Amino acid sequence: DIESNLLNYPEEVFPKPKNADEDLPPVARSFLQQAMDTIHAPDAAAVMAGSAVDAMLKEKGLRKGSLYERIDSALDQNILTQGMADWAHEVRLGSNRPRHADEENPHVTTEQAQQSVDFAEALGNFLFVLTAKIERGIQAAQEEKS
């Protein structure tokens, strides 16, 4: 019967799965979503978080040079603060270890991967999501005046 069958399915998943914000550029959003979805596989999550950061900087027009150079360029252009650039370099280094199979320390911990994912999400919020929300708020206020 249907009622007993429904009892075999969870009503809710805990913790709730996270979704990358729709206001992120598509490539960055895809990488960030993969990072969120693979946090149980820390090396994969760290690599995807690093790729999300890379895609975000490219979306901001920083396409030349290595990711290291692009992070420094973002700092020089005031796209990132010093603290954000420092954290971005940590994410870059963390994603490089599994990506390049570092011989001495190839893996990241779950905590390190989570920090990388958190940074990529925070960077996306700072560079894209907050800006989109502000633009929508301004537009809504202007429409109310009309």
Regions found by a protein language model. Name each.
Residues H40, L57-L62, N125-F128, A132:
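Hydrophobic/aromatic-lined pockets within catalytic cores
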Residues P26, S30-Q33, S51-D54, E69, ...:
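Generic structural signal for well-ordered, non-membrane alpha-helices
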